[in-house]
């Protein structure tokens, strides 16, 4: 579980958003292709489900240190979020 603490669009892309997230014991940066559906302002403060044990990847010159999880609703991504408040760093089982 992660909390989004900052978000901004990746320069030169309509789709990519760079997120700074708190994962409990550290902060990570990730890049997500959700910019056509979410604004950076809508993401700050949200708790999201993410995968943190991935090798870093670079998108348009920006390193991504994880991947957020989303489902699909008629072609639009819907972020997976907890039903109840849980602290950043909580493991998904």
Residues of each region from the PLM?
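Phosphate-backbone binding interfaces of nucleic-acid-interacting proteins
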Residues: 1-93
